[in-house]
Curated annotation (Swiss-Prot):
SUPFAM superfamilies: P-loop containing nucleoside triphosphate hydrolases (SSF52540), Smc hinge domain (SSF75553)
Name of this chain's protein: Structural maintenance of chromosomes protein 1
Function: Involved in chromosome cohesion during cell cycle and in DNA repair. Central component of cohesin complex. The cohesin complex is required for the cohesion of sister chromatids after DNA replication. The cohesin complex apparently forms a large proteinaceous ring within which sister chromatids can be trapped. At anaphase, the complex is cleaved and dissociates from chromatin, allowing sister chromatids to segregate.
Gene: psm1
InterPro entries: P-loop_NTPase, RecF/RecN/SMC_N, SMC, Smc1_ABC, SMC_hinge, SMC_hinge_sf
GO annotations of cellular component type: chromosome; cohesin complex; condensed chromosome, centromeric region; meiotic cohesin complex; mitotic cohesin complex; nucleus
Record text on subunit structure and interactions: Cohesin complexes are composed of the psm1/smc1 and psm3/smc3 heterodimer attached via their SMC hinge domain, rad21/scc1 which link them, and psc3/scc3, which interacts with rad21.
Organism annotation: Schizosaccharomyces pombe (strain 972 / ATCC 24843)
Length: 1228
């Protein structure tokens, strides 16, 4: 193989000007710093070898021309105004024979590329062909690996790998031819299959027509039998129809004669009922007037009751307050009375004390004079001298006596004080016992009041809870009714959107409601009493009813007249009434039933109660509802039926032929929706009435402010009473404790009192002894004095004088003390009485004020009660008058009811007779129609019926209206019946005696069964009567298809052979490459991955998804590094993937290898060990026939190369520059 010698570039990418790069040895490494232009060198090699610019990191070739700035010496850069507009890359290649060849690719100023071989311009195809001869495949790019291609190959899908092998093998060039021949084969095969299927279908059709020929012959024989049986059945049917018509006509004549008598009796009874109705109408008007007055009076009473309840509640509250104030005033008055009594007692006591004091002074003066205690001055002087002498003699005794008297006095005072204390304690105990007794009584009263108030509170709570429960129930019920009302209002709102009711219509509707309330005999509008059987008939029925649509149905003519008078009085407008007792209704013409399958009588598509049948017949008559305008025109204009026809859209064809109406102006059909709207309105009124009643009931269950105040008042009173009860109970307990304390004090002081009494007795005894001694001395000294002044002894004088003086002083002191106490007590009690009187006066003012309010409330209540009583009395009188008038109505109604029963019985009998007549006439009409229909069928189907007279040609093809055949006047006594035969007399001689005598259903079933059997056999045959003609046509087509099938089969065979030839070429090419790559991949991978530790290396192999046509499927690449289990490629590490991808690249390159292999940084993702392995592999396989050019940044790789091309950046020129060195002369 040849080899790459050097490159010459000029103005290509980062290489400015003309530069020579090389020479390139068997293993040349391109090194240099990042950004120096290594990859641009790779792009230059790719460019000169014909690779598209899109693979060279550019969108067009002009971008490959050098563009750069030149740095000047003064460190300023400028753009060269003469930027190059052309560029080229030249590759010097040495052939096997040593001859050199020059490949050059240039970029012209226009942006085009120019290819030259040895400076001779060639085409791209010639250029690529020359390179291909040297195994340099431009499209497969088997000579280079771009930066990142290794990682891309490692992550390729099986289909992408298969496509890569196709490119390498050259089988891809057969793809378009393969696809084209495959399409041609598929089309040819499909055409052949289609021809075969057509031939098979024609064969089946041929067999079918052969079978149909036999079937047609058998069908003709069976048809003759069926026609014979049909003729017998039709003759039997015609015979018995004529027989039934004759017998029914005789029966109709008899029944109509009977009905005349019933009509006369019915008319007499109706006149009597009319008279009663006139009376009833007058009384009913009076009842209506009374009813208005009663309602007005009830409304008046109802309006007064809330005010009456309010006044009663206020009066009750005022009375409660008054009772409280009165109780408080009574307590204050009692206190005032007690205080006044106490004051009076105290004043009486003061008066008595003053009188006693005066009496005492007077008494003391008298006693002093009586006892002679007053001495003369000289006697008194003598007495004083003698007393001084005696005192000197008795000084020691007197000292002792004074000491004893002092002790007696002290002891006596202590005893008196202690006695007083005990007395006070006893008095307090007595007072406390009285207070405890009073408090116990008060506590019992309080407890009774508390229980009474609690009972009242519980009763009030129970009443309020009952009100709450009732209110809650009514509230929930109101909610439910409101929800239902809301739903109803929503429906009314939705219906109102599509409803356009005029004021006049609304007025009429309200008038109808009023008439129904006044007159029970008012049944309602015709529209409300009937509904179409299906919604599609609504417009048609509305048009059929016409002006009778809003007509009102009443029981009698008398009621109708009263209703007319009412609407005249109210000025409502025009309204039509149908009295049920006098309405005239002609029977429905039965012949119209079955006239056309697309038409039916209007009366037959209405649902209504049986009692309204005559009304409905009178309203719609013989009107026919037609499915379409075509049917309506056919019946009205072609068949000339004497009846009104209406289409489903509401278009009316009148008897006169005039056409009116239609869906555009027929709004009457919406009145059925109006009926639903009326029901919704009635429901709304009912719900609102119920809600109003509940709201009225709720008003009586509402807990008013007075109820709350009353409850709080009771609770407050109970709380106060309980507090007072607690205070009283605590006071009782305190007083009992105080009694116990006082009793214990008395027990403590009693022993001390006894001791003082004993001590006092001893002192008195000692004093008496000393006193005797003193008296003896004094008797000696005062003996002469006593005799002179006339006293027995001096001791008596001294005792009387001393006692009198002491008694006077002590008594006078007691009077002063008691007077002071009474005066202070009186002053205090006077102040208390004054304060209590003021409180009492205020209470009396409050009582007067509340009493005045109560009197006002009572007056108002009595006035309202009087008004209510008067109104209720008037209401009772009105009700009595109403009842009186109602009793008159009931009597009239009873009499009218009896007459109505008679009338109903007569009407029932007449209806029964009319029904029988109608039924018989309907049967006659049906029999006649059926007789005509049979003959019409015979005429249309060419059935040869034997005739004695006439011809079937006289029978009209279209059905004829029975309005001229069977008619009724106003009374059933005027029958006009005619059986039109059109001059035809059927000959029944062929009908045997048994069939003439037996007209039963069983005979009909036998004849029909026999006819049905023949018909079913004929129906099952379904012969093709043109089978013989079609058989010849099919045979001709079959011969033609045989020729087409042979040609299609031959074309399919040729297409398949062409396809197999292309397929085989593509398969051989692909299989050759795959087999080679598959054989090489494992040893190459082993060589790349082996090491001293793992001398065998790893394992790699390829598998095909599709063994028959492998290029249609994928190729799976499996690699197992040394000493590792099998894994998918995406589970290998980055280095393992790179090694596997390189092994695959080397294996692919080994198939039709190019003379040189350019690799761009394939070692980027490898560690040092794997880089060394790659370097060793390249070193071992680099030779004169297999040249490696490697771009690398790792010294483990480029250090193994034979030559180095260094690339650096010339900053001054702003261009990439190269340096080359041969390493063969250097020792490793």
């Amino acid at each position: 193989m040849g080899r790459l010698l050097r490159l010459e570039v000029e103005n290509f990418k980062s290489y400015r000007g003309h530069q020579i790069i090389g020479p390139f040895e068997d293993f040349t490494s391109i090194i240099g710093p990042n950004g120096a232009g290594k990859s641009n060198l790779m792009d230059a090699i790719s460019f000169v070898l014909g690779v598209k610019s899109s693979h060279l990191r550019s969108t067009n070739v002009k971008e490959l021309i050098y563009r750069g700035k030149i740095l000047q010496r003064d460190n300023t850069d400028f753009t060269d105004s003469s930027n190059p507009t052309t560029a080229y890359v030249k590759l010097m290649y040495e052939l096997d024979n040593g001859e050199q060849r020059e490949y050059k690719r240039a970029i012209t100023p226009s942006g085009a590329t120019e290819y030259k071989i040895d400076e001779e311009i060639v085409t791209f195809s010639e250029y690529c062909g020359s390179l291909q001869k040297e195994n340099i495949l431009v499209r497969a790019r088997n000579f280079l690996v771009f930066q990142g291609d290794v990682e891309t190959i490692a992550s390729q899908s099986p289909l992408e790998l298969s496509k890569l092998v196709e490119q390498i093998s050259g089988s891809l060039e057969y793809k378009s031819e393969y696809d084209k021949s495959k399409d041609e084969q598929d089309k040819a095969v499909n055409l052949s299959a289609h021809s075969f299927n057509k031939k098979r279908g024609i064969n089946a059709e041929l067999r079918q027509y052969q079978e149909q020929k036999t079937e047609a012959e058998r069908y003709q024989s069976q048809k003759e039998k069926r026609d014979s049986a049909q003729l017998v059945y039709l003759l039997w049917k015609l015979f018995h129809l004529e027989k039934s018509i004759s017998s029914n006509m005789a029966e109709v004549t008899r029944l109509k004669a009977d009905s005349i008598q019933l009509i006369e009796r019915r008319d007499e009874n109706t006149k009597e009922i009319e008279k009663l109705k006139e009376k009833e109408g007058s009384i009913r008007r009076n009842l209506l007037a009374f009813d208005r007055k009663v309602r007005k009076q009830e409304k008046l009473i109802a309006s007064k009751r809330p005010e009456l309840i309010s006044i009663a509640e206020k009066a009750l509250e005022s009375k409660s307050n008054l009772r409280k104030i009165q109780r408080k005033a009574a307590e204050i008055e009692k206190d005032y009375s007690d205080q006044a009594s106490t004051l009076q007692v105290l004043e009486n006591q003061l008066t008595s004390l003053s009188a006693a004091e005066k009496e005492f002074l007077k008494d003391m003066q008298e006693k002093e004079q009586l006892k002679g205690l007053r001495l003369l001055p000289e006697d008194k002087e003598e007495y004083e001298g003698l007393r001084s002498e005696a005192d000197k003699l008795n000084s020691n005794l007197l000292f002792k006596l004074q000491t004893l008297n002092r002790n007696i006095k002290v002891t006596s005072q202590s005893k008196d004080s202690l006695t007083s204390i005990v007395g006070d304690l006893e008095s307090k105990i007595k007072s406390l016992h009285e207070s405890v007794s009073s408090l116990d009584t008060e506590r019992a009263d309080l407890l009774a009041k508390i229980n009474e108030k609690i009972e009242s509170l519980e009763l009030e709570k129970h009443d309020q809870q009952k009100k709450r429960l009732t209110y809650s129930e009514l509230f929930h019920k109101t909610q439910e009714l409101n929800e239902e009302l809301q739903s109803c209002l929503q429906k009314i709102l939705e219906a109102s959107a599509d409803r356009n009711e005029s004021k006049q219509d609304a007025k009429k509707r309200e008038a109808l409601y009023a008439l129904k309330r006044i007159y029970p005999e008012v049944k309602g509008r015709i529209i409300d009493l009937c509904t179409p059987t299906q919604k599609k008939y609504e417009s048609a029925i509305a048009a059929a009813l016409g002006k009778n649509f809003d007509a009102i149905v009443v029981e009698t003519q008398a009621v109708a007249k009263e209703c007319i008078d009412y609407i005249k009085e109210q000025r409502i407008g025009i309204m039509t009434f149908f009295p049920m007792d006098t309405i005239a209704a002609s029977p429905v013409n039965q012949k119209f039933r079955g006239t056309h399958k697309g038409a039916r009588l209007a009366i037959d598509v209405l649902n209504f109660e049986s009692e309204y049948e005559r009304v409905m017949i009178s309203a719609v008559g013989n009107t026919l509802i037609c499915d379409s305008m075509t049917v309506a025109r056919d019946l009205s204009y072609n068949k000339r039926l004497n009846a009104k026809t209406v289409t489903l859209e509401g278009t009316v064809i009148h008897k006169t032929g005039l056409i009116t109406g239609g869906s555009s102006n027929n709004r009457s059909a919406k009145h059925w929706d109006d009926h639903d709207f009326d029901l919704l309105t009635q429901t709304k009124d009912r719900l609102m009435h119920q809600i109003g009643e509940i709201e009225y009931q709720k008003s009586s269950c509402v807990i008013t402010e007075s109820d709350t105040v009353k409850l709080h008042s009771l609770e407050s009173e109970i709380s106060l009473l309980k507090d007072k009860y607690t205070v009283v109970s605590r006071s009782v307990e305190d007083k009992k404790k105080e009694i116990g304390h006082y009793e214990s004090l008395i027990k403590e002081k009693q022993p001390h009192l006894s001791e003082l009494e004993m001590e006092l007795r001893n002192f008195v005894k000692s004093r008496d002894e000393l006193q005797i001694q003193v008296e003896k001395v004094e008797e000696k000294i005062f003996s002469g004095f006593c005799k002179r002044i006339g006293i027995s002894d001096i001791h008596t004088y001294d005792e009387i004088h001393r006692t009198f003086t002491q008694s006077f002083t002590q008594k006078q002191l007691e009077f002063t003390k008691q007077k002071s106490l009474l005066e202070n007590r009186i002053s205090f009690e006077k102040q208390r009485v004054s304060d209590t009187r003021l409180r009492l006066e205020r209470m009396h003012k409050f009582i007067e004020k509340d009493q005045e309010s109560i009197d006002n409330y009572e007056q108002n209540r009595e006035a309202l009660e009087s008004e209510v009583a008067t109104a209720e009395a008037e209401l009772e009188l009105l009700k009595e008058d109403f009842a009186s008038e109602n009793s008159k109505t009931e009597k009239i109604l009873l009499a009218a009811s009896e007459k109505k029963l008679v009338g109903k019985r007569l009407v029932s009998e007449l209806t029964k007779l009319s029904g029988n007549i109608t039924l018989l006439e309907s049967e006659i009409d049906r029999y006649v129609s059926e007789w005509h229909a049979i003959l019409r069928k015979c005429k249309l189907e060419d059935i040869d019926v034997p005739l004695r007279e006439g011809s079937l040609t006289s029978i009209p093809i279209d059905d004829v209206s029975n309005s001229g055949d069977i008619t009724m006047g106003e009374e059933p006594s005027e029958p006009v019946i005619n059986f039109e035969k059109f001059g035809v007399e059927v000959d029944y001689d062929e009908l045997d005696e048994e069939l003439r005598n037996d007209g039963s259903e069983s005979m009909a079933s036998v004849l029909q069964e026999k006819l049905r059997e023949y018909s079913e056999e004929l129906d099952q045959m379904s012969p093709n009567l043109r089978a013989i003609e079609r058989l010849e046509t099919v045979e001709t087509r079959l011969a033609k298809l045989d020729e087409e099938f042979a040609a299609a089969r031959k074309a399919a065979k040729n297409a398949k052979e062409r396809f197999n030839a292309v397929k085989q070429k593509r398969l051989q090419k692909f299989q050759a490459a795959f087999s080679h790559i598959s054989e090489q991949i494992d040893p190459i991978y082993k060589e790349l991955t082996k090491s001293p530790a793992f001398p065998l290396g790893g394992t790699a192999y390829l598998t095909l998804d599709d063994l028959d046509e492998p290029y249609l499927g994928g190729i799976k690449f499996h690699a197992m590094p040394p000493m590792k289990r099998f894994r998918d490629m995406d589970q290998l590490s980055g280095g393992e993937k790179t090694m596997a991808a390189l092994a695959l690249l080397f294996a692919i390159h080994s198939y039709q290898p190019s003379p040189f292999f350019v690799l761009d940084e394939i070692d980027a993702a490898l560690d040092q060990t794997n880089v060394t392995k790659i370097a060793n592999y390249i070193r071992q396989h680099a030779s004169s026939g297999f040249q490696f050019v490697v771009i690398s940044l790792k010294n483990q790789l480029f250090s193994k190369s034979e030559a180095l091309v260094g690339i650096y950046r010339d900053q001054q020129e702003n261009s990439s520059r190269t340096l080359s060195i041969n390493l063969e002369g250097y020792v490793e």
